[in-house]
């Protein structure tokens, strides 16, 4: 049982109890998972800000459990904060902006491919602020939040099925616009990105960008995956939940925070590596979801015998 930092080491094999941490590095990290049971967690990155950390939209959080009998290659994308990405926006989908810092990137884990259509779990990034007091929207969660302050257009929230008004797309936040001495924030990345903001043209009016949405691939959410999905029912996550960036969550370091601040983060906890020779644990598929059996029996000579 060991704890690894995937931004510093390459893990060649895993064991039950291992923790695979993936802080932001500006690039994805790959790890090969043998057949087993795994807990996936992702924290979205915070949107950029100019004068106060409180104005950058906070990132969301998502968690789910995967049971795989064939093993899988996992690609971990920890989003970059808007302040890390500067005007280009945070790594992994943060929306750019013409001046100041862009939107925060979403954080996600992809299975067997680096395609956006292989994302199995996503936490939305927050939108960047428009000006010194014009806040960006928080990331999702099932939905992000719109940029709430200032005057102008765009800055819509990413949702479960669409990008936010202002150029949010599948995986990326929209760009913030500067005009007439006003500044619009960039949208946060995520399942669907938040919209970038365009301030009105009446003067020095600023507006924050929208937050991106989150997603977990489950038996109930799979139907909302857009055309081109590279996942299948054997990869449904269970025990899944999401929290938006305005909710109380546990940070990667174990402290309590309201939404995630700073750069994004991914974590895989190895709950169990399956041993084909052990017999138990056994899993049964019910309504498309793999569940662990608490006991099992085999019929021999017309008699049922409990497996030990």
Roles of regions detected by a PLM:
Residues 1-32, 226-308:
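Enriched but not universal
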Residues 25, 44-109, 129-156, 188, ...:
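Glycine-rich strand-loop-strand elements at beta-sheet edges
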Residues 32-39, 69-73:
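Extended extracellular/luminal ectodomain segments enriched in beta-structured repeat modules
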Residues 65-67, 111-114, 217-219, 267-274, ...:
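Short beta-strand-to-coil "C-cap" segments at the C-terminal boundary of structured domains/repeats
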Residues 87-95, 148-165, 169-171, 222-255:
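Surface-exposed intrinsically disordered loops and tails
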Residues 136-183, 276-280, 287-308:
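Intrinsically disordered, low-complexity terminal/linker regions enriched in Pro/Ser/Gly
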Residues 173-252:
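Aromatic sugar-binding interfaces of carbohydrate-active proteins
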């Amino acid at each position: 049982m060991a704890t690894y930092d995937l931004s510093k080491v390459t893990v060649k094999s895993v064991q039950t109890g291992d923790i695979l941490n993936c802080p932001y590095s500006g690039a994805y990290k790959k790890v090969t998972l043998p057949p087993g049971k795994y807990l996936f967690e992702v924290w979205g990155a915070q949107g950029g800000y100019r004068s106060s950390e409180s104005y950058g939209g906070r990132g969301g959080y998502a968690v789910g459990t995967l049971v795989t009998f064939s093993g899988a290659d996992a690609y971990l994308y920890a989003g970059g904060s808007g302040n890390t990405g500067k005007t280009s926006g945070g790594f992994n989908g943060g929306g750019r902006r013409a001046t100041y810092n862009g939107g925060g990137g979403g954080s996600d884990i992809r299975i067997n491919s680096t395609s956006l259509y292989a994302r199995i779990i996503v936490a939305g990034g927050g939108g960047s602020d428009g000006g010194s007091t014009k806040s960006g929207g928080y990331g999702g969660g099932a939905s992000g939040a719109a940029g709430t302050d200032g005057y102008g257009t765009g800055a819509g929230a990413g949702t479960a099925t669409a990008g936010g008004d202002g150029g949010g797309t599948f995986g990326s936040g929209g760009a913030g616009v500067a005009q007439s001495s006003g500044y619009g924030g960039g949208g946060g990345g995520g399942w669907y990105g938040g919209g970038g903001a365009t301030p009105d043209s009446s003067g020095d009016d600023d507006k924050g960008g929208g937050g991106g949405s989150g997603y977990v691939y489950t038996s109930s959410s799979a139907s909302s995956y857009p055309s081109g999905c590279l996942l299948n029912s054997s990869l449904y996550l269970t025990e899944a939940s999401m929290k938006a960036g305005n909710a109380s969550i546990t940070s990667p370091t174990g402290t309590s925070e309201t939404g995630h601040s700073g750069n994004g983060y991914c974590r895989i906890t190895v709950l169990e590596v399956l041993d084909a020779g052990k017999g138990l644990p056994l899993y049964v598929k019910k309504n498309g979801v793999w569940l662990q059996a608490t006991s099992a029996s085999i019929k021999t000579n017309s008699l049922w015998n409990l497996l030990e």
